[in-house]
Design a protein with these regions (language model features):
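Mid-domain alpha/beta scaffold segments of enzyme catalytic cores
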Residues: 1-163, 167-169, 173-185
């Protein structure tokens, strides 16, 4: 596809590089609105369902990932958008699960979920791992330290598998970027 401006109008692809679709909210109508506005491509990022309960097992995670993949296919078929999928365990899920599963079990489920998402990447069903990162709100020093250690492990896993990550981090500008740079340099 030739990408140019013709008659004052862009005729190339128009991407939403980070969209969550929630079937319990607007679902496909949000994708339809994007297409109606001229959108051509979306990067559908897995969104955990906080309202229907967080996963307690890797089987629960797999079921949630498959729902995201099914949703992507539905958007392709019904709306006609080009859809790329990003799968991964959200850091807020990990932090919330600490309070019910404990730090060790929550962390293990998170890392198992990363491995599962990377398997979907290797199969071609997903293009990246995400959202992974840190909680975007204040947590205890212990949880913050664990989040940083876990993020380093997740980054290493993605790097070794050869897939990009989509980060979920707090909004703290230069400090956040500097912190992430330190983690990347290890």
């Amino acid at each position: 596809m030739l990408m140019t401006i013709s008659g004052g109008r862009w005729n190339g692809p128009i991407w939403d590089t980070h969209i969550h679709l929630d079937l319990q909210a607007r679902g496909l109508s949000a994708a339809q609105d994007f297409a109606n506005a001229g959108g051509t491509h979306i990067c559908l990022v897995h969104k955990p369902s906080f309202s229907s309960g967080l996963p307690k097992s890797i089987e629960d995670v797999d079921h949630a990932y498959r729902r995201t993949l099914d949703l992507a296919e539905s958007v392709r078929r019904n709306i006609g958008l080009d859809v790329r999928v990003v799968l991964g365990p959200h850091p807020v899920v990990w932090e919330k699960q600490i309070h019910t599963l404990g730090l060790e079990s929550s962390t293990q489920l998170h890392l198992d979920s990363v491995e599962l998402a990377l398997n979907y990447c290797a199969e071609g069903a997903s293009v990246a791992l995400g959202e992974v990162g840190r909680p975007h709100y204040s947590v205890s020093d212990e949880i913050w330290s664990a989040a940083n250690a876990q993020l380093e492990t997740v980054m290493r896993m993605a790097s070794q598998a050869g897939f990009p990550i989509q980060l979920h981090v707090e909004d703290n500008g230069a400090k956040t970027n500097a912190d992430l740079g330190i983690i990347c340099d290890r």
